[in-house]
Amino acid sequence: MKRRILPTGTVICGTAAVEQIGYEFSVRGIRRITAVSDSKLLNKSRSLLSDMEPDPGTDIRIISSDEEPPEDTEGLILMGSAPLPETKRRCPVLRIPLVPDDLSSRLPGTDILVLDRRFFRREGLLDQFLRELYRESLSEESSYPFPLQFPGIFQFSADTELIWGDETLGELGELLSRDKVRAPMLVTDRGIVAAGLLKGLLDSLDPGLDIIVRDNVPPDSDLQLIGSLTEDYRAYRRDGIIAMGGGSVLDTAKGMIINLELGGKNILALEGSNLLSPSPVPVYMIPTTSGTGSEATRVAVIADHNEKRKRLFVSQFLQPRAAILDSSLTISLPPYLTSITGMDAMSHAVEAFTCLGKNPLSDLMAWRALELLSAHLEQAVTFPAQAVHRRGMALASNLAGRAFSNSMVGMVHTIGHAIGGVCGAPHGSCMAVLLPFALEYNGDSITEALGKLLVPLKGIDSYEHTAASARGPAVIRHIRELNRSLHTATGGRHPCSLKEIAVKPSDFKAIAEAALGDASLMYNPRELSYGDIIEILKEAY
């Protein structure tokens, strides 16, 4: 079984979404923009584009669809159903549908789709269009039974080509050949080497490739290591990065992209959100766990061991060129690692669905991820060699990654990042322990959204036969029962409390202080104080 899922690019949807266009071109360094419109819509197009707020020095030209774009065009805007013109070079393409008929299909070659809700007021129109647009990404038609809820404006980015299934590792060679990559650096860890997974990858590639391997990535990606890997990348004149491993390896590759963007200066200069420009370095990611979803996200979490904290970087340009999900790579993953990485994916999906940054597309992705986790997590722990469960877990992790990458997360990650930084506890273990306690704390602020999650976790019948006020508590109870079940299935290694992951009460103060500086805190649906964090740590202990 093998599927190729093409990137859907960026969708910007909301009232007056056109006003965001200037930023999208600016962040890509594009100054010469050509807008193409049907001749009958030229006046409307001019009026609409006047709402843009381009950077000084940006030149926007509007032409009819029967004209050729100027040779110096760096970016294209296609108005309505205007066809994609030929240009001297490949340009980013932004499309603005103007009438409902323009939504009949999304033409190939569109990088950014702008859905201005002023043009699509008919109830359910955008709901239906978005479900169909992302049908392939979800691996099937959306089973989400509720109307999509649209905030004032939102953006969803999915720029990574995905190859998913069984025995898909051999597809990497085709990707490298297509992108003319001949001298990549392969980043991994020694566990991957010891398991024989690296040999399998290298054996599948063209022996004529000039590959250098760096297998010294630690369990937490590290600022200093990223610096030395970047120096090697330049010194050996590499032309691409392959990352094979768990979340630490994948985030290390993203850290290299940030460092290359800065020319080797302090990576912390770009800590935060949306400070990166597009990178010319092609990156290919091959996850060997099913939890972080880092191969699909706009996020990199990198350890700063000097400060004992995790640093967060967010940019759509951190998404890799392509990702390969091969079920055979996770079959050797021990039950304990399967369980905690699976709960990491669950925390991503649940927080994406309940945090302040949620949007209709992150809801669809999170929902499908939870359906897959319900079907496959316990089974993958109990029957690790069955490809159907490994395959389901790989896609669940990827979908949950795409969801939270575009909605962000909340206090589970706020506190979990702090515990990881202060105590060195595994991230997935932190997520497993904290998730039910965080949902209890946020409960009154997320009553409706939390209650809906009873459907993917326990089925529509359970949802319909449970009183509205009891649905949220039923979800929390189910997650606790799942943790206990995984605890038993892993011979007691899957944690249900903080004391099981070497957290001590004497660490609580440092954890709470670090948590208050975590960027995910702002997306939590309920305010969280130092005292609140201390109480939650006590409860989870």
Describe each region flagged by the PLM.
Residues 1-79, 141-240:
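ATP/NTP phosphate-donor binding region
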Residues 97-139, 151-152, 262-358, 449-452, ...:
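A glycine/threonine-rich phosphate-anchoring loop and its flanking beta-alpha core
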Residues 291, 399-431, 518-522:
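Glycine-rich phosphate/pyrophosphate-binding beta-alpha loops
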Residues 436-541:
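Mobile late-domain/C-terminal helix-loop "cap" segments
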